[in-house]
Amino acid sequence: MIKTRLSTFFAYLIKNLNNKLYYSLSELTTGLISLLLGFFISTGLSTIPGQTGDWGIIAASLIVAATELTSKIVYSSHKQLNIKINLFNNFKIGITYGLFVDAFKLGS
């Protein structure tokens, strides 16, 4: 095959597209695992303090403080965020979603 500008452009485009897809799928899977781990941890956070009865307010205040601090860090900056901050944000979203699901289960 003759090496033209068009063929080198397409080769470069395919190579970069492969790299982008690989890294984006890697971030997607780790983000999904982090989200599901947060959902799993929320079940423990909602049941363990309920057994003793006196840790409910303290646990709720710690969860709210961590949620607000994470939201402040993630949503205040407009630059590209670190992957660890995104994973922690997904973990926070999983915990919040899990607590809402537990509240709906108790309400029904």
From Swiss-Prot:
One of its GO terms (cellular component) is chloroplast. Keywords: Chloroplast, Plastid. Belongs to the ycf20 family. Its main location: plastid. Coiled coil: none annotated. This is Uncharacterized protein ycf20. PANTHER family: PTHR33787, YCF20-LIKE PROTEIN (PTHR33787:SF5). InterPro entries: Uncharacterised_Ycf20. It is found in: Plastid, Chloroplast.
